[in-house]
Amino acid sequence: MLIRIVRMTFREDKVDDFLEIFNNSKNKIRHFEGCHFLELLRDLDAPHVFMTHSHWETEQALETYRQSELFKTTWAATKVLFADKPMAFSSRVFVKINE
């Protein structure tokens, strides 16, 4: 399982535009083949900073999504709203602690 976190900083006047894009695409992304989890996080101290947190079956599943029309159109509409360059992190669970 691959865990993907993308940190995005938006122009403050474009946050509502981003939220509309996300709300219109979130179910399509979540149900894209290979995606098992999706959530949107908002920074506590900077409300114009968001992170998507998603789980993908494999690196290839994520790459297939990144090459899809869904990603291309969603990303094209989103990236014009940025105030700063986004940061993306791909990880795997290294140690998991259960109670």
Region spans (language model):
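Residue-level signal for secondary-structure boundary sites
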Residues: 16, 60-62, 96
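Short conserved AdoMet
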Residues: 30-33, 57, 83
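Residues within well-formed alpha-helices
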Residues: 5, 24, 51-53, 73, ...
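Non-catalytic surface loops within mature trypsin-like serine protease
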Residues: 10-12, 58, 92-95
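Short, well-ordered beta-strand segments in beta-rich or mixed alpha/beta enzyme
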Residues: 2-9, 39-66
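Short amphipathic alpha-helical segments
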Residues: 14-37, 70-75
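Glycine-rich beta-strand-turn "strand-cap" elements at beta-sheet edges
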Residues: 39-46, 76-99
